[in-house]
């Protein structure tokens, strides 16, 4: 009853199913692996790119250094050959080739550098140190040197060329000496002007201090010499005068300290003058202290005296003097403050 077809079907069906499941799993695994490889490839490529860029930058710097060194060596070799053969160019023609404007600082500096190279000097001239006056003087020096070169070429002797090159160098030294002299003169003039201004400021401050002290002393004496002033008003005037003196002395002390340091730094001869001024100020302070002590010792008007004076006035002439409520209120307000 069993045919071979049915047997194969019964055995092959599960094999087909399990085999298909395994094949699907293998396909999924391969897909995941390929995705992981694709994700890792960009990182490796980026690292390789960075390495290549770094190597290229290092190679470029090394090549630039080598080329600069080679160019410098070639330039010195050319200069040596030109000097040995007497093939030196004219400086005037070099300046004309660079620029037609005689006031161009860049071209003037380049012409000076060429002149130094031709003369065999290694000093470098900065662009900021050259002004319009120096540019004109440099142009004059170049013109004189060009004339000397033309004359030497007419003669046709290399020794005369060397002498003309040597004659150009003193002109540069003279220009630098003139510049240093002008700078030193400007610095000395600036120091003198600063010293004069500080001296004027010091004299003005001294003049302003003397009348201020005299005004304060006069106000103190006038306030304390007035008879019949209540005790509270006298104390208020004392407090006000002390506050004014403290406010005047605090900034004056700070200014005095700053002036001492600065003047002693500029001119040590001002130290003795400042010592005399400090002695005068100390004497003025002692005088003010003595006067305040004498005023405190002097008898003062009390509450009873004021009350008695007011009652006497009211009893002597009650009809002529109407009742003043405002004055009495002021007296009562001032009395407890004393």
UniProtKB/Swiss-Prot annotation:
UniProt keyword annotation of Phosphoprotein present: yes
Lipid bilayer topology: Single-pass membrane protein
Location of this chain's protein in the cell: Membrane
Domain of life: Eukaryota
Spans annotated as Disordered: 290-338
Annotated keywords: Membrane, Phosphoprotein, Transmembrane, Transmembrane helix
Main location, first listed in the record: membrane
Transmembrane segments: 7-29
GO cellular component, one term: membrane
Modified residues (Phosphoserine): 152
Biased composition (Basic and acidic residues): 290-306
Similarity-based family: Belongs to the SPATA31 family.
Protein's name according to its UniProt entry: Protein SPATA31F3
Biological source species: Homo sapiens (Human)
């Amino acid at each position: 009853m069993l045919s071979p077809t049915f047997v194969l079907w019964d055995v092959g069906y599960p094999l087909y199913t399990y085999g298909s499941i395994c094949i699907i799993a293998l396909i999924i695994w391969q897909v995941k692996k390929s995705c992981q490889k694709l994700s890792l490839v960009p990182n490796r490529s980026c690292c390789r790119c960075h390495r290549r860029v770094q190597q290229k930058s290092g190679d470029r710097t090394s090549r630039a250094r080598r080329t600069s060194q080679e160019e410098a060596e070639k330039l010195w070799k050319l200069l040596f050959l030109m000097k040995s053969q007497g093939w030196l160019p004219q400086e005037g023609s070099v300046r004309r080739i660079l620029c037609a404007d005689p006031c161009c600082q860049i071209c003037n500096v380049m012409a000076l550098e060429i002149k130094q190279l031709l003369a065999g000097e290694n000093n470098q001239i900065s662009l900021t140190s050259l002004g319009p006056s120096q540019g004109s003087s440099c142009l004059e020096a170049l013109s004189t040197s060009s004339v000397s070169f033309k004359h030497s070429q007419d003669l046709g002797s290399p020794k005369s060329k060397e002498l003309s090159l040597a004659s150009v160098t003193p002109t540069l030294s003279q220009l630098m000496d003139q510049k240093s002299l002008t700078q030193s003169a400007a610095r000395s003039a600036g120091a003198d002007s600063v010293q004069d201004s500080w001296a004027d400021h010091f004299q003005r401050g001294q003049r302003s201090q003397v009348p201020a002290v005299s005004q304060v002393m006069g106000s103190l004496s006038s306030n304390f010499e007035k008879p019949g002033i209540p005790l509270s008003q006298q104390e208020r005037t004392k407090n006000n005068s002390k506050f004014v003196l403290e406010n005047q002395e605090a900034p004056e002390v700070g200014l005095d300290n700053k002036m001492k340091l600065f003047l002693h730094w500029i001119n040590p001869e001002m130290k003795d003058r400042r010592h005399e001024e400090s002695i005068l100020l100390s004497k003025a302070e002692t005088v003010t202290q003595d006067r305040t002590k004498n005023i405190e010792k002097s008898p003062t008007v009390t509450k009873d005296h004021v009350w008695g004076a007011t009652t006497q006035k009211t009893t002597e002439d009650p009809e002529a003097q109407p009742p003043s409520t405002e004055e009495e209120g002021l007296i009562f307000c001032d009395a407890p403050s004393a």
